[in-house]
């Protein structure tokens, strides 16, 4: 592993970027990070190369970016592939800010994304906030994706207080697994040891579901700030038998964790509905 530079001030947000053979897309991702209106120097960027197999192209791209921004960027290289869940866990261990965010290395974000998200957590003093995505297709077209539903309309207007109804609302609406659109309070993650499953796909679905159990308040911003690249060889598109098996294992792991936390029986109906969704 590799680390350079020390910030004189604690960053506002630590952003974790797992990378695997994405040298082709990293420049656009990095450029969008550099343009953040909240201030590049107010952010911490943790790039985790998950043992890429592209003759160091991805790693060299990350190291070059670290050399340009030694005080804001941390480059971490894994000798063994741990899949996105493992890479994200490593990234969290390096995070110094009060809030944590994630960006996929083949995506990019709007210049004001983190400014808008951070302004929300400051204004509403909430544990987490997220926004909406824009799906970008290879032919240049895009699709504006906005979360709908009564509970999200409510998020847009005010804070949802934590408690039993929060879990029921989560199960009813579903978070969608778009973890990359938000920022999350690090103390909640660390104090409750909320880790991503490793060597499994759909790790975001597990992590966001377990995180929701501990959130006292949450804000949803309807602004579309995250560009979600649609490419045929990405993790989401390569859905074969092993991917479906991973998805089933993730759902079983969620139920097991709910049982360990003592909430399964209380919300069994909602949890089973989510499992069958």
What are these regions (language model features)?
Residues 100:
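Short aromatic/hydrophobic "clamp" motif used to bind/position activated sugar donors
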Residues 30-77:
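Acidic donor-binding segment of Leloir-type glycosyltransferases
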Residues 108-219, 229-242:
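Donor-binding/catalytic cores of nucleotide-activated saccharide
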Residues 229-277:
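C-terminal subregions of glycosyltransferases and related glycan-biosynthesis enzymes
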Residues 11-14, 44, 206:
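Cell-envelope/extracellular polymer assembly enzymes that use nucleotide-activated donors
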Residues 13-25, 29, 36, 48:
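A conserved hydrophobic helix/loop-capping motif in glycosyltransferases and polysaccharide synthases
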Residues 77-95:
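Glycine-rich, basic loop-to-helix element that forms the pyrophosphate-binding segment
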């Amino acid at each position: 592993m590799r680390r350079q530079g020390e910030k004189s001030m604690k960053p506002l947000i630590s952003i974790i970027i797992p990378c695997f053979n994405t040298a082709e897309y990293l420049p656009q991702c990095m450029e969008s990070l550099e343009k953040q209106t909240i201030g590049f120097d107010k952010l911490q960027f943790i790039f985790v190369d998950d043992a890429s197999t592209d003759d160091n192209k991805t790693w060299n791209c990350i190291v070059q970016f670290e050399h340009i921004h030694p005080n804001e960027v941390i480059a971490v290289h894994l000798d063994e592939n741990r899949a996105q869940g493992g890479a994200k866990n490593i990234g969290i261990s390096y995070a110094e800010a009060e809030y944590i965010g994630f960006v996929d290395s083949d995506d990019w974000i709007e210049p004001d994304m983190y400014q808008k998200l951070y302004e929300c957590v400051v204004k509403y003093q909430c544990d987490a906030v997220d926004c909406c995505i824009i799906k970008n297709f290879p032919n240049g077209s895009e699709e504006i994706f906005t979360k709908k539903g009564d509970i999200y309309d409510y998020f847009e207007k005010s804070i949802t207080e934590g408690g039993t109804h929060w879990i029921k609302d989560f199960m009813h609406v579903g978070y969608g697994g778009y973890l990359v659109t938000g920022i999350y309070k690090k103390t909640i993650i660390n104090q409750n040891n909320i880790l991503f499953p490793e060597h499994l796909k759909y790790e975001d679905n597990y992590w966001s579901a377990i995180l929701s159990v501990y959130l006292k308040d949450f804000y949803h911003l309807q602004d579309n700030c995250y560009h979600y690249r649609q490419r045929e060889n990405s993790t989401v598109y390569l859905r074969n038998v092993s991917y479906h098996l991973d998805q089933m294992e993730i759902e079983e792991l969620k139920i097991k964790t709910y049982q360990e936390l003592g909430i399964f029986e209380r919300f069994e109906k909602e949890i089973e509905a989510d499992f069958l969704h």
